[in-house]
């Protein structure tokens, strides 16, 4: 079982915690991680982009000049793609970019992402993450003390508006709850900062 030290918000070590070998000590499957990140990003796309083809642009119903005798190239409409104000040839149309992943693969991807953070030493367990009021300074001080000044994902056992809003204005910092963590956010963060209570919740729900 992986053993990780526990620190307080001042960065001082206050103990250690044994993590689930299934969740935090799994073999990292890079192929599944790639598939999970790709699915996550593709599923964020709305797919509503659209352009007008020659049949959808207004006007152009009349042949601009007669077929023969003018010396000019034959044209059937002023809305052909080669014309100014003409329709778009092969332009984007609305489509569904959604990619499905089965539950087992999602679970393997999550285990791999969490295990990769532990292996790299980028998982930081804090005994308790809390703020007395909306204090960005408190969160900034904590992140600096524990060595997570840059991109950090803070995971809580439940929604805490004081913590969420205190961290909201810190660049590169995202706050979430244990049951909404995803592979992309975990891998995108330099440090995975999680409270001791949130670790217990993760092991309870995802084991």
Predicted features and spans:
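Glycine/serine-rich anion-binding loops at beta->alpha junctions
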Residues: 54-91
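Short, structured surface segments that line ligand/substrate-binding pockets
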Residues: 46-49, 55
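Extended polybasic, low-complexity segments that bind anionic RNA or targeting/receptor surfaces
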Residues: 1-46, 91-207
């Amino acid at each position: 079982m992986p053993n990780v030290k526990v620190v307080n918000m001042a960065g001082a070590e206050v103990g250690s915690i044994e993590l689930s070998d299934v969740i935090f000590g799994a073999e990292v499957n890079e192929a599944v991680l790639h598939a999970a990140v790709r699915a996550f990003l593709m599923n964020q796309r709305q797919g509503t982009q659209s352009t007008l083809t020659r049949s959808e642009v207004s006007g152009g119903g009349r042949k601009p000049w007669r077929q023969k005798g003018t010396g000019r190239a034959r044209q059937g409409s002023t809305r052909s793609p080669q014309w100014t104000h003409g329709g778009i040839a092969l332009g984007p149309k609305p489509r569904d970019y959604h990619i499905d992943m089965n539950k087992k693969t999602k679970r393997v991807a999550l285990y791999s992402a969490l295990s990769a953070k532990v292996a790299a030493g980028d998982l930081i367990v804090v005994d308790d993450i809390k703020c007395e009021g909306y204090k960005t300074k408190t969160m900034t001080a904590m992140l600096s003390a524990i060595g997570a000044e840059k991109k950090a994902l803070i995971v809580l056992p439940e929604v805490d508006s004081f913590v969420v809003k205190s961290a909201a204005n810190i660049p590169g910092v995202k706050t979430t709850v244990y049951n909404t963590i995803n592979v992309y956010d975990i891998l995108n963060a330099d440090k995975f900062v999680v409270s001791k209570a949130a670790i217990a919740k993760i092991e309870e729900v995802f084991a």
